[in-house]
Amino acid sequence: MGKVNEVLFMNRGEGEISYAQNSAFTQKVASMAMPALENAVETLFSKDFHLLQALTAADLGCAAGPNTFAVISTIKRMMEKKCRELYCQTLELQVYLNDLFGNDFNTLFKGLSSEVVGNKCEEVSCYVMGVPGSFHGRLFPRNSLHLVHSSYSVHWLTQAPKGLTSREGLALNKGKIYISKTSPPVVKEAYLSQFHEDFTMFLNARSQEVVPNGCMVLILHGRQSSDPSEMESCFTWELLAIAIAELVSQGLIDEDKLDTFNVPSYWPSLEEVKDIVERDGSFTIDHLEGFELDSLEMQENDKWVRGDKFAKMVRAFTEPIISNQFGHEIMDKLYDKFTHILVSDLEAELPKTTSIILVLSKIVG
């Protein structure tokens, strides 16, 4: 697999398997977390940030769907509300949209309508800029951000976990692409260690960029259980591994490619997130909660329609990194196989998806 920061991005464009057309679930997650963002803006104003001429915010891992537009609109709306309540001067809002270099910034900015940004004569003038690069390192000058938002991005890792091959060069997570019930303990330990390292790097970079008392609102894909091999946190990757294994058995994929591939993502528990933040010591935890949503739109009666929708959603965020390992030419067959395996499981109750909302304040001093 190539370097993660070169191959990790959502499916580009606006076609039927693009992220832009298959982000309904993450939109639902974002809407559930929107009160936390609204409260963060309220908190900033309570700390006299309304005295500033401009509020600077960043949406990290913004991708190219409509979610980031909702973030901008929410921040702007809350600023306008506080301006009217506090009779403060006209404010300016600077928003930086960040993602890795492979992100579809063209589709992103093409969708940035005047309805989102508004005009420069309103109570809050809004200016938007793109910032390509990895949020695991520094992106902005010191003490330049008042508010940081990130949704469904921080659980991605900078690389596949280290130490997943034996001294003899044998794969320790053979036949799997993520933590599973059959994975040896070293696999779980390696994933947690990599997440700890990467999330700590993220916090360290933001601690230098966020002003004292500034806020961060982070939404992560997570889990309720303390065991990362429970189906709630490995369901998607388990089905993908089964689909890949079937293509291996048909001679369409080299077995070694499966055995040496481990997804660079980790869905943490609330306790793990809390522990890392407290160990870092740069931020206080204002709010931490987990909530569950159905993985599929259960109001759709036809299981094939439901399965197809879920498969397209999964393909939208997994295909670039999966195709880099297994080849672009096999993707249609792989996700068709994934859909068939998924539909055969739809008779049973599927695990709900857990999301984590984490609100942090930069410690003064």
From Swiss-Prot:
Q: In which pathway does it act?
A: Alkaloid biosynthesis
Residues binding S-adenosyl-L-homocysteine, per UniProt:
Y19, C62, N67, D99, L100, S134, F135
Cofactor binding mode, per the note? Binds 1 Mg(2+) ion per subunit.
Q: Which residues form a coiled coil?
A: none
Cite the InterPro entries for this sequence: MeTrfase_7 (IPR005299), MeTrfase_capping (IPR042086), SAM-dependent_MTases_sf (IPR029063)
Q: Is Methyltransferase a UniProt keyword of this protein?
A: yes
Question: Which keywords does this Swiss-Prot/TrEMBL entry list?
Answer: Magnesium, Metal-binding, Methyltransferase, Transferase
Q: Where does Mg(2+) bind?
A: N173, D259, F261, N262
Provide the residue positions that the database annotates as binding caffeine.
T26, Y152, H155, W156, H221, F317
Q: Which Pfam families match?
A: Methyltransf_7
Cofactor dependence: Mg(2+)
| GO MF entries | metal ion binding; methyltransferase activity
- Provide the site residues for: Involved in substrate discrimination: H149, H221, S265, M313, H328
What pH dependence does Swiss-Prot or TrEMBL list here?
Optimum pH is 8.0-8.5.
Main EC class of this protein?
transferase
Q: What is its EC number?
A: 2.1.1.159
**Known catalytic reactions:** 1,7-dimethylxanthine + S-adenosyl-L-methionine = caffeine + S-adenosyl-L-homocysteine + H(+); theobromine + S-adenosyl-L-methionine = caffeine + S-adenosyl-L-homocysteine + H(+); 7-methylxanthine + S-adenosyl-L-methionine = theobromine + S-adenosyl-L-homocysteine + H(+)
- An example of a Gene Ontology BP annotation on this entry? methylation
Entry-linked PANTHER family: S-ADENOSYL-L-METHIONINE:CARBOXYL METHYLTRANSFERASE FAMILY PROTEIN (PTHR31009)
> What does this protein do, in the record's words?
Involved in the biosynthesis of caffeine. Catalyzes the conversion of 7-methylxanthine (7mX) to theobromine, to some extent, able to convert paraxanthine to caffeine and, slightly, mediates the conversion of theobromine to caffeine.
The entry sums up its family as follows: Belongs to the methyltransferase superfamily. Type-7 methyltransferase family.
The protein's name is 7-methylxanthine methyltransferase ICS1
Question: What is the source species?
Answer: Camellia irrawadiensis (Burmese tea)
